[in-house]
From Swiss-Prot:
The protein's name in its UniProt record: A-type ATP synthase subunit F
InterPro entries: ATPase_V1-cplx_f_g_su (IPR008218), ATPase_V1-cplx_fsu_bac/arc (IPR022944), ATPase_V1_fsu_sf (IPR036906)
Function per UniProt: Component of the A-type ATP synthase that produces ATP from ADP in the presence of a proton gradient across the membrane.
Membrane topology of the entry: Peripheral membrane protein
Keywords of this entry: ATP synthesis, Cell membrane, Hydrogen ion transport, Ion transport, Membrane, Transport
Species annotation: Pyrococcus horikoshii (strain ATCC 700860 / DSM 12428 / JCM 9974 / NBRC 100139 / OT-3)
GO MF: ATP binding; proton-transporting ATP synthase activity, rotational mechanism; proton-transporting ATPase activity, rotational mechanism
Compartment(s) of residence: Cell membrane
Sequence similarity: Belongs to the V-ATPase F subunit family.
Keyword Transport attached: yes
GO biological process: proton motive force-driven plasma membrane ATP synthesis
Covalent S-S links between cysteines: none
Principal localisation: membrane
């Protein structure tokens, strides 16, 4: 199964360098967001896609993401960092690992 990345050009270039061959660049313009929505719908329907990585900012602009078991859709931070902040990350780690991370 393939891993696909959707996001801004800098994030996409980084993942291409890491070996992800199917990568789609989008900016945050209205037209580009609509193209991203359509591409996401297309990717979700494909049988050969196992994981879709999408930047948090793009996912936020797209709106509600499809609720599917496969492919797995993971939101990732872009070059500016997470839009959800450290507090959410701490909570996720606390739930997953069972310990609280403090600075």
């Amino acid at each position: 199964m393939k891993v696909v990345i959707m996001g801004d050009s800098d994030t996409v270039v980084g993942f291409r360098l890491a070996g992800i061959h199917e990568a789609y660049e989008f900016d945050l313009s209205e037209l580009s967001i609509e193209r991203a929505r359509n591409k996401l719908k297309e990717l979700v329907e494909r049988d050969d896609v196992g994981i879709i990585l999408i930047t948090e900012r793009l996912a936020q602009k797209i709106g509600e993401l499809p609720q599917v078991n496969l492919p797995i859709i993971l939101q990732i931070p872009d070059k500016f960092g997470s839009i959800y902040g450290e507090e959410l990350l701490r909570e996720i780690v606390r739930r997953a690992v069972g310990i609280e991370v403090k600075r």
